[in-house]
Amino acid sequence: MRILGILGSFLGAIPGVILYVLLTRINFYGSIATIIMYYGAVGGYNFLTEKLKKKNYDEIQERESRFNAIKKENFSSFSFLFSVIPSILGVYLAEVINFSIDIKAEYPESPIGEIVPFAMANVFSPEFNYLIYIIISCALVIISAVVLFYKSREMMKY
């Protein structure tokens, strides 16, 4: 069941990666999309594992209760903590895509097969300005994880 949740977590982070790249391309602060990336990863994990938990799955009742409150049986602590991994990998992927697009715009004659490995190897280089965005984005992912983890613990008490 966790394997399916892990797959859902990676799939749930994809819209955040796309939004991150789009916001960065229009010269907006793309790191805001990491919050969506993290919540998408948590939602993807819980969405795929929740259907397996219930043998008599009632979709209408699920839709009504999904956004009402966080209940202990709906969310697992593992999903909150594990979803940090796909989110941070998504930040790396989004920055590599942005860096590759910037290189391709500057050197249009270079093939993409050479650009992407160069971007993957040099995205952490202090010579380029991408490292600060990666640090800020990863910090936002971790802050989102901590806030969601503690808020869910607080809400589960009631």
Q: What are these model-derived regions, one by one?
A:
Residues I3-F10, I32, S77-L81, I134-I135:
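Hydrophobic alpha-helical transmembrane segments
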Residues A33-Q61:
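Canonical alpha-helical transmembrane segments
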Residues E73, S77, P86-Y158:
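C-terminal binding/interaction regions
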Residues Y20-I32:
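Membrane-helix interface and helix-disruption motif detector
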Residues L4, G8, G12, G16, ...:
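Alpha-helical transmembrane segments in multi-pass membrane proteins
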Residues M1, L11, P15-G16, F47-Y57, ...:
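Membrane-interface extramembranous regions at the lipid-water interface
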Residues I18, Y39-G44, S144-V147:
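Transmembrane alpha-helix boundary/anchor motif
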Residues R63-L81:
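Membrane-interface segments at loop-to-transmembrane junctions
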